[in-house]
Amino acid sequence: MALERIAPGRELPHAPGWYGRAILINLVQVAITFATNHLWLDLLSGVSLFHLARLENAVMQGFIGWFVGTFVFYWWHRVRHLPGFWVVFHQVHHSPARIEALTAFYKHPVEILTDSALAAIIMYPLLGSSLEGALWFNFFAAAGELFYHANIRTPHWVTYFIQTPELHSVHHQLDVHHYNYADLPLWDRLFGTYRDADTFAARCGFPRNNERQLGRMLLFHDVYKD
């Protein structure tokens, strides 16, 4: 976030009330994350398909889990763009005109909770991770989301390894909201949803000032074309 202030990637539009909305939703994200860490461990640990905890190295557990998670979440991300799923889970995240680090976790609480549960299913009953490994998974996933939502410029070669802010601006582009779903562009390239970009999309978010209708979005009203 400091780098965004020192060397911003582009000038972001003025969005009345944005910081208040963003801080509120980000606090909800933090609260849900902390509240569910031990809950998922209690509910989902025990029997697992694999036994990642045997590695003992929690960082490696988290990294392997994150890599597997990028594939699972690629498909879950595509599902969230389907009619019905979009309104319930994902339109809040796509509504802001400003794509910056604060936007990374600007999500409907239902989406936050569902993402948290899916990550826990990957780490516990699927991979058999320890709690420490799951926390590292969260770290890698959060770092990735903060990076590719950040308002910073990146060299094009980075796109061969990880999603960049330029690539992800296409995903949030006004009247597009498609392409570049994955943390790893590998999955988008393999499944035909990759769109290359070395500059930022001109406009992102919802038309007019519809992003300000946060209350209606939280109540599952589709506000995109209002």
Question: Which sequence ranges carry the predicted segments?
Answer:
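Membrane-helix interface linkers and caps
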Residues: M1-A22, N37-R54, T199-R203
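Juxtamembrane helix-capping/reentrant segments at transmembrane boundaries
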Residues: R10-I32, S95-K107
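Core segments of transmembrane alpha-helices
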Residues: Q29-N37, P109-M123
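Cytosolic/stromal cytosol-facing helical appendages immediately following the last transmembrane segment
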Residues: L3, W86, S95-Y106, L127-S130, ...
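Active-site His/Glu-centered metal-binding helix of metallohydrolases
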Residues: I6, V72-W75, V79-P83, V92, ...
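Hydrophobic alpha-helical membrane-embedded segments
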Residues: M1-A2, F34, G65-R78, G144, ...
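Membrane-embedded alpha-helical segments that form the functional core of polytopic membrane enzymes
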Residues: L52-R78, A134-L135
